[in-house]
């Protein structure tokens, strides 16, 4: 990508781990600022000379047993320059099905919108279900966002309604 002129790469939500159980997901929760996924992303950014919006990975939240679904941004020197914790968690019952999703049972919600300066422009960070909440995007644009990033991992039963 860098050879073709790219300066920014964006990875999907849950790019590093899409486990089938919450117990498995909890086993890969990383401390803020350190962990194998964060180290790998920092190294990739350095080696490739790219800024990376690293989709999401579970990152511990002090004072909460639930991790954040955190979107981390790494600059081309491998430094973490921004963190956005998904604000709008996906809680839904699927009509006509005996299944649903309760992301809030296993993830702590974020609190603040984040805009980060990158070589591509000012990027407003959001994740997946956030796209259902236009006020978040209005706020990001008011805060100077020129590009809106929406890493997502919708499932087949729910994705069609969102895209």
Question: What spans do the regions from the language model cover?
Answer:
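Residue-level detection of beta-strand scaffold positions
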Residues: 48-50, 140, 145
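Active-site catalytic loop in hydrolytic enzyme cores
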Residues: 43, 62-143, 151-163
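Cys-nucleophile CN-hydrolase/nitrilase-fold catalytic domain and related Cys-dependent amidase chemistry
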Residues: 1-77, 81-85, 91-92, 155-163
């Amino acid at each position: 990508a860098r050879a073709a002129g790219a300066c920014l790469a964006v990875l999907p939500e849950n790019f590093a781990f899409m486990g089938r159980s919450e117990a498995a997901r909890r086993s890969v929760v990383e401390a803020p600022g350190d962990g194998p996924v964060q180290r790998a992303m920092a190294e990739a950014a350095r080696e490739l000379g790219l800024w990376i919006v690293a989709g999401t990975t579970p990152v511990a939240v002090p004072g909460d047993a639930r991790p954040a679904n955190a979107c981390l941004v790494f600059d081309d020197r491998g430094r973490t320059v921004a963190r956005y914790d998904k604000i709008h968690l996906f809680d839904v019952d699927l009509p006509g099905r005996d299944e649903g999703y309760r992301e809030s049972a296993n993830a702590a919600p974020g609190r603040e919108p984040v805009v980060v300066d990158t070589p591509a422009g000012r990027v407003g960070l959001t994740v997946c279900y956030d796209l259902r909440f236009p006020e978040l995007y209005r706020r990001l644009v008011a805060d100077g966002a020129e590009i809106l990033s929406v890493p997502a991992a919708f499932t087949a039963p729910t994705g069609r309604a969102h895209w």
